[in-house]
A protein has these predicted regions:
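Terminal alpha-helical segments
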Residues: 2-92
């Protein structure tokens, strides 16, 4: 989730700089990275349900990071949309 988070904030920085195509590419990268992290999470949850995965602080932290990054993805998508709207309407 850490790589996805970095890509999300890079996308926001690119959008703020008016580099919308680059911003979109960063968002695509972040989405790909988040899907991979989510797949790993699903695997771990399945193992936990089967009783074959001991609980650890590291796993709790990883879960928290993934959930936070997914929330940030949604917010950053909306922020980039606002930046795009403002740019298209000349700030009006």
């Amino acid at each position: 989730a850490g790589e996805a988070r970095a890509s999300l904030y890079q996308a926001l920085d690119k959008a703020r700089a008016g580099e919308m195509a680059e911003s979109e590419q960063c968002m695509i990268e972040a989405d790909t990275q988040l899907k991979k992290a989510h797949d790993v999470q699903t695997e771990l949850i399945t193992r936990d349900l089967n009783g074959s995965l001991p609980m650890s602080l590291l796993l709790v932290h990883a879960q928290d990071q993934l959930m936070t990054t997914m929330s940030e993805q949604s917010l950053i998508e909306h922020m980039i949309g606002l930046i795009r709207d403002i740019g298209m309407n000349g700030g009006k």
